[in-house]
């Protein structure tokens, strides 16, 4: 069981055939919670990362937590269909 965390800033990123990146994470953000409406591939990185079809697989409707560094972003690309990636900063 996962311990409780404080939810911070949330944003949605469109999932499509081309990579799309989120806004930069806040200065106190070391973890993000993500959930997608359709299967996709994700990459977290500095600057503006570009998600590739060989990056980490995220199935639809399965919340996942990732460690990050303040100022990083998450990029997403569809597996087979478009959708929405919900990204929530966790404090």
PLM regions: where:
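Short, surface-exposed beta-strand/strand-loop-strand elements in extracellular ectodomains
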Residues: 35-54
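General beta-strand recognition
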Residues: 41-43, 75, 86
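A structural detector for beta-sheet-dominated domains
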Residues: 14-16, 26, 35, 69, ...
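Surface-exposed ligand/attachment interfaces on beta-rich extracellular proteins
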Residues: 7-28
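Noncatalytic modules at the cell exterior or secretory-pathway interfaces
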Residues: 29-32, 67-83
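Predominantly extracellular/luminal regions of secreted and cell-surface proteins
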Residues: 1-3, 31-33
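Short beta-strand-to-coil "C-cap" segments at the C-terminal boundary of structured domains/repeats
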Residues: 46, 88-91
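Glycine-rich strand-loop-strand elements at beta-sheet edges
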Residues: 48-69
């Amino acid at each position: 069981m996962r311990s409780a965390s404080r939810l911070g800033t949330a944003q949605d990123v469109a999932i499509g055939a081309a990579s799309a990146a989120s806004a930069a994470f806040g200065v106190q953000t070391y973890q993000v919670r993500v959930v997608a409406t359709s299967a996709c591939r994700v990459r977290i990185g500095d600057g503006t990362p570009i998600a590739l079809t060989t990056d980490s697989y995220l199935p639809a409707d399965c919340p996942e937590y990732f460690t990050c560094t303040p100022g990083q972003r998450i990029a997403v690309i569809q597996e087979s269909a478009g959708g929405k990636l919900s990204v929530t900063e966790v404090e």
